[in-house]
């Protein structure tokens, strides 16, 4: 089997390559079909997924069985001021990959986000794959357009929405909170935006379980359990052992101090219903996955040996 991983330098791409290389994750083994897979990892500048001709030629030349698209413009605030760049990476890129995958018969795994939802229809119920999206930010809008292109142009697709991703590698909320706690000793974090923290280990594991099947469609894949950013930050500080206080604030209070920030959904909790009903949901409770992260994290070096 031949697999192409786009955007391999990011959090998820790095973790997927690690699991393919080692044949397993913290959760369990990867599918047997992937143990001797040929893996082609590509990122900018070698492949710009927003360039149709470049994508078409690259996919036709390599003829993969599976394409896992981890490439995206994920800076939520940056998307508000760089609309064209966000559209090219988050919408045109997936369109180009979908068309190339359809031509060559490849399966396409496309990673999306909880930010396709408005978060306004609360009720305390996690949103499953049947919930109608309604993005309130440029990031969410461009990611939703990418989903639609994948659905339209490639019938062998897996669209996998995730949320609040962190990993041993790259920049993420966990590392930001740890570093800010060390630097300032006191943090204010919003307590009225709720979702599902997701360890990249869990997401990569589930993607690799899915990609060898024919269970095509839309999936949610996030850490089990729901919390606010304040709850998440408090648990990060507790597990890290950093001597810092975490205080709650509202979204409105945060926005007043950071008027340039994009609107974010107040309720974007996802339900992994499709995973449970198809290949099985091995995703850990967010607290357990976070504790495991701190047990293995080696600071700037990534993961402990």
Which residues does each predicted region cover?
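N-terminal Rossmann NAD(P)H-binding glycine-rich loop of SDR-like oxidoreductase domains
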Residues: 1-26
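Mid/C-terminal beta-alpha module of Rossmann-like enzyme folds, strongest
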Residues: 15, 206, 213-260, 301-303
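Rossmann-fold cofactor-recognition segment
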Residues: 38-53
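NAD(P)H-binding glycine-rich loop region in Rossmannoid oxidoreductase-like domains
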Residues: 49-89, 100
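Catalytic helix-loop patch of NAD(P)-dependent Rossmann-fold dehydrogenases
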Residues: 88, 92-96, 103, 107, ...
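NAD(P)-dependent short-chain dehydrogenase/reductase
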Residues: 148-195, 200-202, 208
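Glycine-rich Rossmann NAD(P)(H)-binding loop
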Residues: 189-194, 219-226, 278
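Amphipathic terminal alpha-helices
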Residues: 285-305
């Amino acid at each position: 089997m031949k697999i192409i991983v786009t955007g391999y330098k990011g959090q998820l791409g790095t973790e997927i390559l690690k699991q393919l290389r080692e044949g397993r994750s913290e959760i369990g083994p990867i599918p047997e079909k992937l143990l001797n897979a040929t893996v082609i990892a590509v990122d900018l500048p070698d492949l710009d997924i927003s360039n149709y001709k470049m994508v078409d030629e690259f996919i036709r030349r390599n003829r993969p069985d599976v394409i896992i698209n981890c490439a995206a413009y994920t800076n939520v605030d940056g998307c508000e001021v760089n609309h064209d760049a966000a559209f090219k990476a988050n919408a045109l890129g997936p369109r180009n990959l979908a068309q190339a995958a359809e031509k060559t018969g490849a399966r396409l795994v496309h990673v999306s986000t909880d930010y396709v939802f408005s978060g306004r229809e609360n009720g305390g119920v996690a949103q499953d794959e049947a919930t109608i999206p309604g993005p309130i930010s440029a990031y969410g809008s461009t990611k939703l357009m990418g989903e639609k292109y994948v659905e339209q142009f490639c019938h062998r697709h897996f669209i996998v929405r995730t949320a609040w991703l962190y990993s041993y590698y790259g920049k993420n909320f966990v590392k930001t909170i740890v570093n800010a706690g060390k630097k300032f000793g006191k943090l204010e974090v919003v307590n009225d935006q709720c979702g599902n923290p997701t360890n990249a280990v869990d997401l990569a594991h589930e993607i690799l379980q899915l990609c060898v099947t024919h269970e095509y469609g839309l999936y949610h894949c996030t850490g089990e359990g729901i919390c606010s950013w304040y709850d998440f930050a408090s648990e990060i500080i507790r597990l890290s052992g950093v001597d810092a206080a975490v205080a709650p604030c509202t979204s409105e209070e945060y926005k007043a101090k950071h008027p340039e920030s994009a609107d974010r959904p107040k309720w974007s909790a996802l339900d992994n219903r499709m995973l449970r009903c198809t290949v099985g949901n091995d995703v850990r409770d967010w607290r357990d996955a976070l504790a495991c992260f701190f047990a293995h994290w080696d600071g700037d070096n990534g993961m402990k040996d």
